UniProtKB/Swiss-Prot annotation:
PROSITE patterns: HWTX_2. Disulfide bonds join C52-C66, C56-C77, C71-C82. One of its GO terms (cellular component) is extracellular region. The lineage of its organism: Eukaryota, Metazoa, Ecdysozoa, Arthropoda, Chelicerata. Keywords: Disulfide bond, Neurotoxin, Postsynaptic neurotoxin, Secreted, Signal, Toxin. Residues 23-48 form a propeptide. GO terms for molecular function: toxin activity. Monomer. Expressed by the venom gland. This is U4-theraphotoxin-Hhn1a. Pfam families: Toxin_20. Neurotoxin active on both insects and mammals. Residues 1-22 form the signal peptide. It is found in: Secreted.
Length: 85
Protein backbone atom coordinates (compact mmCIF):
# COMPACT_ATOMS: atom_id res chain seq x y z
CA UNK A 1 0.00 0.00 0.00
CA UNK A 2 2.80 2.44 0.91
CA UNK A 3 4.65 1.61 -2.31
CA UNK A 4 1.57 2.38 -4.40
CA UNK A 5 1.11 5.70 -2.63
CA UNK A 6 4.77 6.61 -3.19
CA UNK A 7 4.51 5.71 -6.89
CA UNK A 8 1.35 7.80 -7.31
CA UNK A 9 2.89 10.81 -5.55
CA UNK A 10 6.09 10.48 -7.60
CA UNK A 11 4.12 10.37 -10.85
CA UNK A 12 2.10 13.41 -9.77
CA UNK A 13 5.27 15.35 -8.96
CA UNK A 14 6.82 14.46 -12.32
CA UNK A 15 3.64 15.52 -14.11
CA UNK A 16 3.60 18.89 -12.31
CA UNK A 17 7.27 19.55 -13.11
CA UNK A 18 6.77 18.56 -16.75
CA UNK A 19 3.74 20.86 -17.10
CA UNK A 20 5.60 23.77 -15.51
CA UNK A 21 8.57 23.31 -17.83
CA UNK A 22 6.27 23.16 -20.86
CA UNK A 23 4.55 26.40 -19.82
CA UNK A 24 7.92 28.13 -19.41
CA UNK A 25 9.02 27.04 -22.88
CA UNK A 26 5.75 28.29 -24.36
CA UNK A 27 6.16 31.66 -22.62
CA UNK A 28 9.73 31.97 -23.92
CA UNK A 29 8.66 31.19 -27.47
CA UNK A 30 5.95 33.86 -27.29
CA UNK A 31 8.48 36.40 -26.06
CA UNK A 32 10.72 35.57 -28.99
CA UNK A 33 7.82 36.09 -31.41
CA UNK A 34 6.96 39.43 -29.82
CA UNK A 35 10.52 40.63 -30.44
CA UNK A 36 10.32 40.05 -34.19
CA UNK A 37 8.08 43.02 -35.11
CA UNK A 38 10.65 45.52 -33.75
CA UNK A 39 12.37 45.60 -37.13
CA UNK A 40 9.02 46.17 -38.81
CA UNK A 41 8.28 49.04 -36.40
CA UNK A 42 11.65 50.61 -37.19
CA UNK A 43 10.78 50.53 -40.90
CA UNK A 44 7.43 52.21 -40.20
CA UNK A 45 9.17 54.88 -38.12
CA UNK A 46 11.59 55.58 -40.97
CA UNK A 47 8.69 55.90 -43.41
CA UNK A 48 6.95 58.38 -41.11
CA UNK A 49 10.13 60.42 -40.76
CA UNK A 50 10.53 60.51 -44.54
CA UNK A 51 6.90 61.46 -45.20
CA UNK A 52 6.99 64.23 -42.63
CA UNK A 53 10.25 65.82 -43.81
CA UNK A 54 9.29 65.55 -47.50
CA UNK A 55 5.91 67.21 -46.94
CA UNK A 56 7.59 70.08 -45.07
CA UNK A 57 10.23 70.54 -47.77
CA UNK A 58 7.58 70.73 -50.50
CA UNK A 59 5.69 73.42 -48.59
CA UNK A 60 8.89 75.41 -47.98
CA UNK A 61 9.75 75.43 -51.69
CA UNK A 62 6.32 76.89 -52.43
CA UNK A 63 7.18 79.89 -50.20
CA UNK A 64 4.60 78.82 -47.66
CA UNK A 65 5.09 78.26 -43.98
CA UNK A 66 5.63 74.64 -43.19
CA UNK A 67 2.35 73.41 -41.78
CA UNK A 68 3.27 70.27 -40.02
CA UNK A 69 1.50 67.22 -41.36
CA UNK A 70 -0.33 65.23 -38.72
CA UNK A 71 1.17 61.79 -38.41
CA UNK A 72 -1.18 58.94 -37.58
CA UNK A 73 -1.10 56.49 -34.69
CA UNK A 74 -0.04 58.79 -31.85
CA UNK A 75 2.72 60.54 -33.83
CA UNK A 76 3.09 64.23 -34.71
CA UNK A 77 5.46 66.25 -36.86
CA UNK A 78 8.09 68.25 -35.01
CA UNK A 79 11.28 69.68 -36.49
CA UNK A 80 10.52 67.94 -39.80
CA UNK A 81 10.36 64.59 -38.03
CA UNK A 82 7.55 62.40 -36.76
CA UNK A 83 7.79 62.00 -33.01
CA UNK A 84 5.73 59.88 -30.64
CA UNK A 85 3.14 61.93 -28.73
Amino acid sequence: MKVTLIVILTCAAVLVLHTTAAEELEAESQLMEVGMPDTELAAVDEERLFECSVSCEIEKEGNKDCKKKKCKGGWKCKFNMCVKV
